[in-house]
């Protein structure tokens, strides 16, 4: 885990240094892009950080979910292998209804409610001793996380201050950075404590995501 984390650090730093040299996508936007290249709106930055947190939480399931079930909850290898499949299946189905939910209730309520649901799911993962209930909890977590990232991309693209392509690429860059950095960090902490305690990082990430959702609500007004 630590070696993977150390290997990802130079990539992240290099990407940050080279980001300002990227060419604008459209020639007609060159002048506007030059003026706003270093002025990413706060709403886009908040969306990017929240996407990082959401992707990191999702990544923790793929990287550590099966190992957590088999080593901490003492599930069989076959049952442990079900974790990510169930989580991904629930996420897929939930994202199919994400757009209707956004149209019905609005983008911010979907993000806030999704954060609460995913937090409840992660609490269940850490609390229940029953393997079946842990699987259900992972499903609840996936249900909550599913609509968050697509909604964040949509909100960033509609920021109105920088081109949609620049906004969504910023969100994507930060989001995939979360997949690179956070799951290995959980492994590093698990080496120094245990996997159960290390996964409390995910609970903290979701709590932070909820707090930022409240900030995003103020910025969106």
Which sequence ranges carry the predicted segments?
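Extracytoplasmic gate region of multi-pass secondary transporters
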Residues: 40-92
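Structural signature of the two symmetry-related core transmembrane helices
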Residues: 109-124
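Helix-to-loop junctions at the C-terminal end of transmembrane segments
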Residues: 94-106, 190-191
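Paired small-residue
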Residues: 121, 132-140
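Intracellular juxtamembrane helix-capping segments at the cytosolic ends
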Residues: 146-160
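C-terminal membrane-cytosol helix-exit motif in multi-pass small-molecule transporters
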Residues: 3-29, 212-217
